[in-house]
Amino acid sequence: MSGNPGSALQALSPTPPERGSFPLDHEGECTAQMMEYLNCMKLVRGENAPNCRLLARNYLKCRMDHRLMDRDEWAHLGLPDDKRAEAAASADSARPPRQ
């Protein structure tokens, strides 16, 4: 008796990871960018702040540059392009922090 039900031999074909899953940064190549982003999120108490989105963009760019994730357009990742990101960050930094 074989361990394969129905005695059918089927080759298992690997499937690519789902969109949004990517390799861990074992070498710590993007740790600094990640920590900047997480600290920003902590400061704004998890709100969707433009300056934090710019840091998220820097983190994802680092991951793409080090081939830890596939390159994609910023719009597909929910982030603004270069001009909009810089304008939003400069406008947000001019505002006083909320209490």
UniProtKB/Swiss-Prot annotation:
Q: Which GO terms describe its biological process?
A: mitochondrial cytochrome c oxidase assembly
Give the Polar residues compositional bias ranges.
Answer: 1-13
| Annotated spans, Disordered | 1-26, 77-99
Quote the subcellular location field of this record. Answer: Cytoplasm; Mitochondrion intermembrane space
- Annotated CHCH domain ranges read 27-70
- Positions of disulphide bridges: 30-62, 40-52
Q: Where is this motif: Cx9C motif 1?
A: 30-40
Keywords tagged on the record: Cytoplasm, Disulfide bond, Mitochondrion
Instruction: Please tell me where this protein is predominantly located.
Output: cytoplasm
Where along the sequence does the record place the motif called Cx9C motif 2?
A: 52-62
Q: Which PROSITE patterns match?
A: CHCH
| Composition skew (Low complexity), residue ranges | 87-99
Query: What superkingdom does the record give?
Result: Eukaryota
Annotated Basic and acidic residues bias: 77-86
Pull one GO CC term from this UniProt entry: mitochondrial intermembrane space
Functionally, this protein is described as follows: Required for the assembly of mitochondrial cytochrome c oxidase.
- Of which family is this protein a member? Belongs to the COX19 family.
Protein name (database record): Cytochrome c oxidase assembly protein COX19
